[in-house]
Curated annotation (Swiss-Prot):
Source organism superkingdom: Eukaryota
Protein name: Oxidoreductase AN1597
Keyword Oxidoreductase belongs to the record: yes
Organism: Emericella nidulans (strain FGSC A4 / ATCC 38163 / CBS 112.46 / NRRL 194 / M139)
Gene Ontology MF terms in the entry: oxidoreductase activity
Keywords: Oxidoreductase
Top EC category: oxidoreductase
Regulation: induction: Expression is positively regulated by the cluster-specific transcription factor pbcR.
Length: 295
């Protein structure tokens, strides 16, 4: 799609999951795996700036999309304002991008470098201040996305089970991103054999699952603008350079379309040398489910 030698970008370390030697899946609710504290290996990859090529990548085709948003939210710590103002703005943004007949906001998180207590995230039912993750992952499997939407919206359980829906993440910074940018992988090129399921069980009884990502390739970026080749595909990473609060990175977290699974987009944060001494990064991210079959 894009000449691999042309896009601006950076070389950065990307953290992947190291599978169990016996081929067994990660243990259910393995917090150390989820937080990137064990079974991890790092590869240097090329991360390309999406902004000059934003018209060439779409949510439907690649699993992510550049978008602009001019939010009227004035206080990212005010839960009422977030739900009454920001949710409506993001619902409209997602509806404009997808053409969905119905969009429902059901989660938000304000992330900083200081908060990293996964247990607190679970205790407060998906709300709160959360630290950044440092391992490549996909938030839900298609079945995990179905479980979450049915749990959050029980009156829609039959509709989503028999129709089409997708969980979508909208990632927007509160200030210009100066360190730990979000990167996303081109879903059209990601080899499915590199996705490994991990089961999750929440305190409230919800059962879900997400993907951790392995990398089997030997062609990491090194010092050149090269995608990481792995299996029959490649890991092609993108970010928005110096992302502003008026810019959003919209990406899929899995779902179903007419009974066919939609695999979400692998993503993570990364650090590059010029960013190490930059200021703290603040970000607001939200998840949205939309039922394309809803009238």
């Amino acid at each position: 799609m894009v000449d691999a030698t042309s896009p601006p970008g950076v070389n950065a370390v990307v953290n992947y999951y190291v599978p169990n030697s016996d081929g067994s899946p990660p243990a259910t609710n393995d917090m150390a795996v989820m937080l990137g504290q064990k079974d991890m290996i790092s590869h240097k990859m090329r991360i390309r700036d999406l902004r000059p090529y934003k018209e060439e990548y779409s949510l439907d085709r690649n699993g992510f999309q550049y978008a602009t948003i001019h939010s009227t939210l004035t206080d990212a710590t005010d839960e009422t304002q977030i739900k009454e103002v920001y949710y409506r703005e993001i619902e409209k943004l997602v509806q404009d991008i997808t053409g969905a007949k119905r969009v429902l906001a059901f989660h938000h998180a304000v992330r900083t470098r200081t908060g990293n207590e996964f247990g607190e995230q679970i205790k407060d039912r998906y709300q709160g201040v959360e630290g950044p993750a440092y391992r490549v992952h996909i938030d839900q499997t298609p079945q995990g996305a179905l479980s979450i939407v049915q749990f959050m919206f029980p009156d829609l359980a039959d509709d989503v089970r028999n129709g089409s829906f997708q969980v979508i993440n909208v990632w927007r910074p509160l200030t210009r991103v100066q360190r730990d940018p979000l990167m996303v992988a081109d879903a059209a090129e990601m080899p499915p054999e590199d996705l490994l399921l991990i089961s999750r069980k929440y305190y409230n009884g919800l059962h879900s699952s997400n993907f951790v990502i392995k990398y089997d390739g030997r062609m990491a970026a090194g010092e050149g603008p090269t995608d990481g080749l792995s299996g029959d595909g490649k890991h092609s990473w993108w970010y928005i350079g110096d992302q502003e609060p008026t810019e959003a990175l919209v990406f899929s977290s899995s779902g179903f379309r007419n009974g066919k699974a939609i695999i979400g987009t692998a993503h993570d944060l990364y650090s590059a040398e010029p960013m190490i001494n930059a200021y703290e990064r603040k970000n607001a991210s939200s998840l949205y489910g939309h039922d394309e079959s809803q009238i």
